[in-house]
């Protein structure tokens, strides 16, 4: 008989909600455990089977920690601002707030149907004014400290979508959404000065228990480089430009210089003969995103300006080119090219037949760039020196002659924070007619996003908010000065930068969260989510957290102590699940056909949590069969508890029980859920062979099962005669002395070849082993007619008989 999952799951989900089983108590002195999921964007498509993988992992840890005596904070909320809801509103004319609310209701229903132990009293929604009041408050603090500023920046403008797109949202010159053409144009944008935190964001990674691959991605994104700035004069003019290089020691090998097509000097230095070619190239580059321009695999393109720079080291004239791989927004927007010792410069030089001059020995620079160390040649006062010494000497020379200076640069750019969109947090700033700007005072927050039917882009590059005249235009009640509200909104990242803080104190009207509660719960103990957020979300959240630490709001320097990335669940054909491929598996269907416990068990048993694994219907069926076996072991056909249950402990199942408690606990704590589940299966196999089921062991088993299959475990716990929930029962402990084997297997060898395997007492000494080996029937046969010359016995391992 199999269990009726629909009935059991509904019953216990209602019980948990009605009894607020997982509501967190602040009033106790238990140790804390804060388990956080990356909260979802509530899309119209609903939950897919990839979501519950991470959620089940944090839920297992949360349920186990409660039973281990921890006070557990395990919340859920919605990252609900964003482009898809706005696009839906544009396409249908419906209100994005209404659409978002329906999606959230659907997500909540789906998540509750999977039995996760969230404290629903702490649910948050980034589009709720009581929430974004504090997102806006943080922005005003950044503004006060000079970390939020307005700048003219070249951006990816998409006329069809009427908004600016991040580099990551542009593919091959077209928008990721809809495939519309994208062009580069300068625009007034809000920026956040994340670069002010670059060194701390880098250094503090060392203390975090995060996957090394994610730390490396952040290190590369921040991209700290040490080197020098070198100043070049432009021949025949008073103009100069500066380049940053990590290899100032190769200055004598510079063959040409390259400016970004947008560089401010390009127009001034281009000769009349080259003007047409330069203008055409500049126009062509405008349609490309930064990611495309810096793609290492693409063929190098560029145009000569007709102008020459003067090498400060030797007075040589270097032709100045423009090329799209140099970005105005990165470094100084200019590079000195040393083709003999830089791969990209070498490729460019080969395409355009530019000279290649070796200045470091060790390679064949006719064939390829040599980037290793070696003795300097053709380098004046650096000749004979190795790289490190030559760099030091060149920097000293540059500083002495005022031709340059030592410099540290970062790949990290300031964060482009504004969006020309409606569905986001309004930026709480007013621009006055006298040219000044002020932040909206804290007592006037939240600055509410006004309702409007006019969500289409304004077309001017401003957001649709610019169309709402009565909202935009303001008058200062004290001075009568007229002003305009900022019409840009915040990016979707804003609300997710600090949501983990609001979960700690979600209803507080006076503070982002109370200092006492932040002190109690921070940092987050485990944060589980997809690796696609490795850089942006995690870096932005760390930046805001460090800022809040600096202004005394939070007590820790870092938000997330341990981070774990679950793998991806692929379609049965090993391809990524997507609507277009028609291979998306809907959890609602699985909950209906197999049950939530089966889905949870299957997703944890598929393989290691961090691996990407293909969905398998037969694997799902196997998970259900195991739960049915568990049910049948405990419950008779008539629905009553089996008569095999005996009171207390006893020797039956003793060893496998203690082994199961040990292995499940260790594996769950290490997030090796698949191996923990394997051990639960071992226990059930042994239990089926037993004539009696000692209550202590089977109750312990139900507790071990409960984090994975909570509905089934609650039902079995009730059938075992208990009232109330299993959620706060004590986690089982194991006795190490019960794990010691009474018997061990040894091998018996004859002249070094294995002839038999024997089970012998674990404490058998050499003499006993010799006797046991010789008494074995198989060994006797092999020894017939032979004389024993020597017996070597190793207790617990083997007996080797030498005979001829």
Swiss-Prot record:
The residues that hold ATP are: 579
Q: Where in the cell is it found?
A: Cytoplasm
Where can the motif 'HIGH' region be found?
A: 40-51
| Enzyme type, top EC level | ligase
Q: Which GO terms describe its molecular function?
A: aminoacyl-tRNA deacylase activity; ATP binding; leucine-tRNA ligase activity
- Cited InterPro entries: aa-tRNA-synth_I_CS (IPR001412), aa-tRNA-synth_Ia (IPR002300), Leu-tRNA-ligase (IPR002302), Leu_tRNA-synth_edit (IPR025709), M/V/L/I-tRNA-synth_anticd-bd (IPR013155), Methionyl/Leucyl_tRNA_Synth (IPR015413), Rossmann-like_a/b/a_fold (IPR014729), tRNAsynth_Ia_anticodon-bd (IPR009080)
Q: Which Gene3D superfamilies does UniProt cross-reference here?
A: 3.10.20.590, HUPs (3.40.50.620), Isoleucyl-tRNA Synthetase, Domain 1 (1.10.730.10), Valyl/Leucyl/Isoleucyl-tRNA synthetase, editing domain (3.90.740.10)
List the GO biological process terms. leucyl-tRNA aminoacylation
Q: Where is this motif: 'KMSKS' region?
A: 576-580
Enzyme Commission designation: 6.1.1.4
Specify where it is mainly localized.
cytoplasm
Q: What top-level branch of life does the organism fall under? A: Bacteria
Q: Which cysteines are joined by disulfide bonds?
A: none
**SUPFAM superfamilies under this entry?**
Anticodon-binding domain of a subclass of class I aminoacyl-tRNA synthetases, Nucleotidylyl transferase, ValRS/IleRS/LeuRS editing domain
Under HAMAP family, the record lists: Leu_tRNA_synth_B (MF_00049_B)
Family of the protein in this entry: Belongs to the class-I aminoacyl-tRNA synthetase family.
Q: Which PANTHER family does this chain map to?
A: LEUCINE--TRNA LIGASE, MITOCHONDRIAL, LEUCYL-TRNA SYNTHETASE
The protein depicted here goes by the name Leucine--tRNA ligase
Organism whose genome encodes this protein: Bacillus velezensis (strain DSM 23117 / BGSC 10A6 / LMG 26770 / FZB42)
Q: What is the lineage of its organism?
A: Bacteria, Bacillati, Bacillota, Bacilli, Bacillales
Originating gene: leuS
